[in-house]
Amino acid sequence: MVSIRPDEISSILKQQIADYDKSVSVSNVGTVLQIGDGIARVYGLEKVMAGELVEFEDGTEGIALNLEDDNVGVVLMGEALGVQEGSTVKATGKIASVPVGEAMLGRVVNPLGQQIDGKGEMATTDSRLIESIAPGIIKRKSVHEPMQTGITSIDAMIPIGRGQRELIIGDRQTGKTAIAIDTIINQKGQDVICVYVAVGQKQASVANVVEVLKEKGALDYTIIVNAGASEAAALQYLAPYTGAAIAEHFMYQGKATLVIYDDLTKQAQAYRQMSLLLRRPPGREAYPGDVFYCHSRLLERAAKLSDAMGAGSMTSLPIIETQAGDVSAYIPTNVISITDGQIFLSSDLFNSGLRPAINVGISVSRVGGAAQTKAIKKIAGTLKLELAQFDELAAFSQFASDLDEATQKQLGRGKRLRELLKQPQFDPLNLAEQVAIVYAGVKGLIDEVPEEEVVKFARELRDYLKTNKAEFLKNVLSEKVLSEASESMLKDAISEVKSSMLAA
């Protein structure tokens, strides 16, 4: 018979007691009562926070948006095919956050900051809350540096400054995204980090944008956040906030950033869908009462920070799609009232061949004038007025049979100015080229050039300046003013190009 040794037993017990870990893990859990249409009603989760991330049994994440007496309304961020009635839900104790940092440059991510471009994981250690409070008055500085878009009509007449919020608004297929992409391409070499947020877009359209940016060498300083049309409404709603959080990280490091939200109409529709399914009371056009706050808290995060805060900036270009040019609808009027100006694109102008199809008469920039460079401000001062007068005269001349010489001359100049401002897609102009083109039109130096030859003249003038007057381009780009020496060089170039064209 085996003898029992008490000392052995006591040593084993002592060892077990020494190894015993009495830490207790407490989880805040609940049970799914009802699920459907991307919304789950959950019983339990007593200590859940508003906006807290929750995790379902199958790993799907959701956000607790409605905290009611007897249940919690959770919006799902995914298909959640494995979630059913009775499934367990666990509160994570975390608010939605996104990875940020230099490693994200050139990458395509989803609204949760996870890579979706197949290039492998991103080596980021920093993260930032998706929702954060906008900088206060003391932390800000007035907008005073230009954000060149490379589009002559915008930089000359509707200038944008770093830290501004400028709305791009127009019907579908009027070139809204093209303006945004041109602006990103034009930031090459300007030390600006760009974030392009695609909300509810076709995957093919986003792939095309990525391809264009890669081709133009602009993907190296751009981050793309994509919540496609097939994604859950919660992800489409979150995408703009994710883009803002990624840009904010760089802004607080003292860098200049540019964020494009393409487009906020689809974000508002996703938010409306979520709110109605959560049984929140509908308001105008069935949008919830806080849809204004949804956009204002996003766009207020754009800022030009004070020197004490590092002097970084975040410029926002939100895009809104209108129906049949109706800017008095609910979402367009909301966003117009939040932003510092709007660029209005007209389908009539687009179809008549004027591209970019900017309606200069009703487009404004409320703070950009202070940021405009002296070189273009000096010569473009009368441009907007001349085009407005031309539009009036053109409308009037349809009914008049014979026009006096002065009116005919004014109409001719207006038509040539219109032609000068035409610009091909993905071909932004630098400041010096814009100065040259606007100068030629405003000073009446191309009044003899036939109307149909004006676009060709602008192209040839750019080529001539690059090959024969490189000093002019260098001077204007470095000094940001049009000096007398530069002006005489420009006059020579214009007369040279004009005479060679007219001789031909």
Curated annotation (Swiss-Prot):
UniProt site (Required for activity): 363
Record's keyword terms, sorted: ATP synthesis, ATP-binding, CF(1), Hydrogen ion transport, Ion transport, Membrane, Nucleotide-binding, Thylakoid, Translocase, Transport
EC number(s) recorded for this UniProt protein: 7.1.2.2
Gene: atpA
NCBIfam families: atpA (TIGR00962), PRK13343.1 (NF009884)
GO cellular component, one term: proton-transporting ATP synthase complex
Membrane topology category: Peripheral membrane protein
Keyword Oxidoreductase (UniProt): no
Source organism of the structure: Prochlorococcus marinus (strain NATL2A)
Family label: Belongs to the ATPase alpha/beta chains family.
Matches recorded under InterPro entries: ATP_synth_asu-like_sf, ATP_synth_asu_C, ATP_synth_asu_C_sf, ATP_synth_F1_a_nt-bd_dom, ATP_synth_F1_asu, ATPase_a/bsu_AS, ATPase_F1/V1/A1_a/bsu_N, ATPase_F1/V1/A1_a/bsu_N_sf
Reaction catalysed by this enzyme: ATP + H2O + 4 H(+)(in) = ADP + phosphate + 5 H(+)(out)
Gene Ontology molecular functions: ADP binding; ATP binding; proton-transporting ATP synthase activity, rotational mechanism
Source taxon at top rank: Bacteria
Complex and partners: F-type ATPases have 2 components, CF(1) - the catalytic core - and CF(0) - the membrane proton channel. CF(1) has five subunits: alpha(3), beta(3), gamma(1), delta(1), epsilon(1). CF(0) has four main subunits: a(1), b(1), b'(1) and c(9-12).
Protein name: ATP synthase subunit alpha
The protein's role, per its UniProt record: Produces ATP from ADP in the presence of a proton gradient across the membrane. The alpha chain is a regulatory subunit.
Xref: PROSITE patterns: ATPASE_ALPHA_BETA (PS00152)
Subcellular location: Cellular thylakoid membrane
Gene3D superfamilies with a match to the protein in the record: 2.40.30.20, ATP synthase alpha/beta chain, C-terminal domain, P-loop containing nucleotide triphosphate hydrolases
